[in-house]
Amino acid sequence: MSTAARIAPRATARLQLHAGFTLDDAALQVDYHARLGVSHLYLSPVGCAVPGSTHGYDNIDPTRVNPELGGETALRALSDAARAHGLGLLLDIVPNHMAAHPGNTWWMDLLRHGRDGRHGAWFDVDWDAPGAGGRLLLPVLDRPLEQAIADGLLRLEGDDAGGWVLRHHDQVFALAPGRAGAPRGAGARAWGAGGKAGTRRGEGALQALLERQHYRLIWWRAGNDRCNYRRFFDITSLVALRCERADVFRAVHALPLRLLAEGVIDGVRVDHVDGLTDPSGYVQRLRRALDAAGARRGLAAGEALLYVEKILAPDETLPARWPCHGTTGYDFMDQVGALLHDPAGEAPLASLWTRACGGAGAGR
């Protein structure tokens, strides 16, 4: 086992991975970072994300390394290169949310089968919210539903499995199976091709089809008032996961725990820990899981690195009951930023702001 696994972090170099800067590209820079003096490379999320993602936080499959980044083979090659230079690897993980995207099989299963499906309880949906009618409310339409139907913006399309999905611009929604789903045969093909588009009969049939689904499409302007699922802040396309459930936790963390046990990575950084239902319980559960995985490669309890993205208020400290190595350093960056700024510059900068804005924002 490499001694890099036991190096105490002194500085990390964060690498933002995407199709234009892959794991292979990162491997070419290992020598530079080693000479720079960092102890660990800190990687942005490597799970499968929305195609073309430039950041990786819109993941659609956390169980596989994104092929756009080079896949697991490239990740292992980067790890080997880092080890050869005495560096460790930290991996950013995203347990709070996933992207609502047709490539997300968990999400599409939820749309197709509703609360009683295999993944019906995996996402944080309040199925019994007042006015929801036991359905998931999706504030995704750019106009009211009736107008969207009349304008031909909701259409049936064939999918790769030989079935049907519903499309609204670049958004795709699974349909319930059986009689609740799309019509069959030549009638369905004609409808999907637009044979009934624009007719009252066709609009009524589409409305009836939508009423049989486990979700209801609503105008985005109603989102804040009617949305009945937890989001990443107010981003409708990022749907919160219920990592407090053991089955969800296992599925989301299977890849990083395996990579840790096999010596590919040395620890994790948890994105948006405060977004989770039970941050304290989550950190404690993750610590136990990391310890179990680390033991398989000879690490002592608490040795696998665990950092959390925790934005501390000026009078806030990291909870002592959280068994982690600390935050990702936003509080430290604030202190460094304050050190590098001359407090005497506040008055002239405020004056410049006032003149540039014509008095707007004065005193702020």
Q: Model features per residue range: what roles?
A:
Residues 145-147, 250, 362-363:
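Short linear interaction motifs
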